[in-house]
Amino acid sequence: MVSHQFLPYLDYIKICLASPERIRVWAQRILPNGQIVGEVTKPETINYRTLKPEMDGLFCERIFGPIKNWECHCGKYKRIKDKGIICERCGVEVTESKVRRHRMGYIELSAPVVHIWYLKGMPSYISVFLDMAAKEIEQVVYFNTYIITHSTAENKQIKYKQLLTEDEWVLIEDQIYRNEIQGEIEIGIGASAILKMLKDLDLSLESDLLRTKLVNLKAVKKDKIMKRLRIIDNFMVTGASPSWMVLNVIPVISPDLRPMVQLDGGRFATSDLNDLYRRVINRNNRLKRLEEILAPEIIIRNEKRMLQEAVDALIDNGRRGRVVVGANNRALKSLSNIIEGKQGRFRQNLLGKRVDYSGRSVIVVGPDLKLNECGIPKEMAIELFQPFLIHQIIKEGLANNMKSAKKLMQKHTSVTIELLQKIIKWHPVLLNRAPTLHRLGIQAFDPVLVDGRAIRLHPLVCPAFNADFDGDQMAVHIPLSIEAQTEARLLMLAPNNFLSPATGQPIITPSQDMVLGCYYLTNNNLANQKGSGHYFSSFEDAIIAYKQKLISLHAFIWVKFYGTINNLDIGRFIKSTLCKNKLTTTDYYENLQVKKDIEGTITCQFIKTSVGRIFFNIAISGNLFFSTSNHNK
């Protein structure tokens, strides 16, 4: 864990391979008597009689800390005044029990094992480093074939990294014994052979050789070499060694992250990780005993393979071979299962955790809202803006303390709503819809109080959130500080996010029923409509006539227009007439009638339109010029 005093000096956090020495440093502590603790050597968890953790076991208090605050294992020290003392009898440090959430242990393996992520992952890093097929390496790791790890033999049939069966190796041994093969040959099997080959790699030399090969190669082979070169360069930059992909030490995570809980009736419920760690420790201890008693090689190899499989199950259960199951044939959750996926530690508990001053509800359409507004239910707003509301109630003198202010607030009186209206007037809120795949997945809006329990959303911002109104839910967050509110208003307000950051194209565009409505209003309906051909002195007169049902929505009418007409398709010229007084002329076009005086000055003009198009023009006036043509998307 990072101490808070160092946080201001951090530039970044890097995740990389850990060396065996680093893993030991995480867990090892030196007691005043010189004893080094940290290694977990026993598979036991708790003593069934005393219900206390077993020493050197998976819940050991000496390694991970006391289970009770300020109390050691043997009970000699039980007070906070003994803080920091390490008990002479049991070796447990007198401290808070919360240290069991971050103190780690480790298991020292009797034989190296390959990390399954780097063997079975995509790409397989070990196969890329050794320039071998992943299946070939798998055969070696699980003790099915031998591999030549070093060769100076002149025989061309014997090459470095060549795979050998048991019979082939016996034949080569006979040839070496009879001096038919000159030079040294070393073979290996299991993870130890892979470890030796990775240690023998010179990364800088390999990098130089690959760069030399790239000069005169075809595209297909070049891609393969580039892939290998990129991984080698990344290891060199981070200072990681390829041999760290083979584990000699396994970290044991803190016991409070894999708890054991006592149920009613005396039974215990435990994390699956404890079972997986227990399998590793049992097999590791058994391998150690077999090596001590000089057991036959075939038995030791079988135990090493079982240890490899136990570590595989601990890291990623089911990635290779049979899934390790517990009670009721349920697959045990490994470290990978805990952190991956939607229900994993990152997405469920870190990115998706619940925070204060936030709410969640179903969204419904709010067509009467402005683009920068969203509808927040009154019940939700009172709860979310509670600190601001309590402060305002006390400031207005409606209550003397927080307790009475809370009581007044919970009554939802008209006074409370008025104060809330005043508070939210300049206080933006953040709306977020999961999954937040790009930055427009969370935007700021000015809240508007609405009845009901649903959040109202402007239909034009739906494409940015990829939202629809078939039951989608959205989260509301309240920026508390002035800095957060300012940033939300300047950078995150919906009208300020008009363009998609990915393509640069407008993302606030009308769609679906909005386009259909625009088409319906501006449609050329050729059928006989009520009131067609009537003349009106203004748009308002035409709307009044429509409301009185004197004309239909799509009837073509002539409306007097005083402004400048731009971008109007006036259609073909029909005729020009001279009035009886011979002082004015009228030019008739398909969509326009223009009256001019004797000097040619326009005195009056009528445009051909419909009430639907007038409504459409009013809706978009100030942004677009009036047009009588259909407005398709």
Curated annotation (Swiss-Prot):
Q: Name the reaction it catalyses.
A: RNA(n) + a ribonucleoside 5'-triphosphate = RNA(n+1) + diphosphate
List, separated by semicolons, the cofactors it needs. Answer: Mg(2+); Zn(2+)
One cellular component GO annotation, for this chain's record? chloroplast
Q: What is its main location?
A: plastid
Q: Which SMART domains match?
A: RPOLA_N
Q: What GO biological process terms are annotated to this protein in UniProt? A: DNA-templated transcription
Q: Could you list this entry's UniProt keywords, alphabetically sorted.
A: Chloroplast, DNA-directed RNA polymerase, Magnesium, Metal-binding, Nucleotidyltransferase, Plastid, Transcription, Transferase, Zinc
User: Where does the record say this protein resides?
Assistant: Plastid, Chloroplast
> Which residues of the sequence carry a binding annotation for Zn(2+)?
C72, C74, C87, C90
Q: Which GO terms describe its molecular function?
A: DNA binding; DNA-directed RNA polymerase activity; magnesium ion binding; zinc ion binding
- Check the record and name the Pfam families matching this protein: RNA_pol_Rpb1_1, RNA_pol_Rpb1_2, RNA_pol_Rpb1_3
Source organism, top-level taxon: Eukaryota
Task: Summarize where Mg(2+) binds, as residue positions.
Answer: D468, D470, D472
Subunit and interaction comment: In plastids the minimal PEP RNA polymerase catalytic core is composed of four subunits: alpha, beta, beta', and beta''. When a (nuclear-encoded) sigma factor is associated with the core the holoenzyme is formed, which can initiate transcription.
Explain the purpose of this protein.
Answer: DNA-dependent RNA polymerase catalyzes the transcription of DNA into RNA using the four ribonucleoside triphosphates as substrates.
- Please report which protein family the annotation says this sequence is part of: Belongs to the RNA polymerase beta' chain family. RpoC1 subfamily.
Listed name of the protein: DNA-directed RNA polymerase subunit beta'
